[in-house]
From Swiss-Prot:
Gene3D superfamilies with a match to the protein in the record: Globins (1.10.490.10)
Heme in keyword set: yes
Protein name, UniProt field: Globin-5
A GO MF label: oxygen carrier activity
Lineage: Eukaryota, Metazoa, Chordata, Craniata, Vertebrata
PROSITE patterns for the chain: GLOBIN
Amino acid sequence: MPIVDTGSVAPLSAAEKTKIRSAWAPVYSTYETSGVDILVKFFTSTPAAQEFFPKFKGLTTADQLKKSADVRWHAERIINAVNDAVASMDDTEKMSMKLRDLSGKHAKSFQVDPQYFKVLAAVIADTVAAGDAGFEKLMSMICILLRSAY
């Protein structure tokens, strides 16, 4: 299933949740490295997205991005937000509240172009569980909620 950022998706099944937790656990256990790798892959594949991060200005190579404390800090925040979503799969109201709050911050305070949520979600899905429909469904749920303030 391709990742979507509008509309709705079916709830996750118990089997999908189990598979997501299993795929996510090793990624989160090395979240500092995994998060940076994901964010660097996102910026190298979508350089225009970097303009929404003023602190990353002038970081033009993957090596510069990996060494940046600001990149590492933001990568950790992204990984922790996904981890919160994984942890909240059984409480979608809790997940929704957190992600709607995050949407508001990105829309109003940071003025991020929402098209990039889906692009980043695809990088995360490819890294964690390439081609897994359940993980892509979770990423779709996240993207739909992140667009809610736009």
